[in-house]
Amino acid sequence: MNVINIEHLTHSFTERLLFDDVSFYLSDKDKVGVIGINGTGKSTLLKIIAGKETADRADIIMQRDLRIAYLPQIPEFADTHTTLSGALPLTEEISDQPENYIPQAKSMLHQLGFTRYDQPITELSGGQRKRIALVRT
């Protein structure tokens, strides 16, 4: 069963054509790797699939109950974020109050090896920040 069908994907980035009428599908059993040299559109393709970026042209059909999370290469956090606040969903993307997510976020952070929830994001390594961003997705 196909969970994603993409047809006629065309997209440019600053005058450079990244995708020219590309079509493909992913089934529920597929495991896919996206490989290529720097600047060929790997991250852009994933952002388009996740709905974080809009293609110049594409017909994208996804299974109705499909949930997609996108974890950027370099997660962005405010300098004021702590381990816990950085793990909470972004308030403009959720309908509930962030406080409703605190117990689940703490549990997931603990599973990933975090014990201090008040530690400033600025004190964490890139890998630690990526794990916090994973909790947020």
Which residues does each predicted region cover?
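ABC-family P-loop ATPase nucleotide-binding domains
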Residues: 2, 8, 66-68, 73-132, ...
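Helix-to-loop junction immediately C-terminal to a conserved catalytic motif
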Residues: 50
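Conserved hydrophobic segment flanking the Walker A/P-loop of ABC-type ATPase nucleotide-binding domains
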Residues: 26-28
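ABC nucleotide-binding domain "signature motif"
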Residues: 56-64
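Conserved N-terminal beta-strand of ABC nucleotide-binding domains
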Residues: 8-10, 21-24, 59
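The feature captures the beta-strand-to-loop junction immediately N-terminal to the Walker
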Residues: 35-37
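Conserved structural motif at the start of ABC-family nucleotide-binding domains
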Residues: 4, 18-21
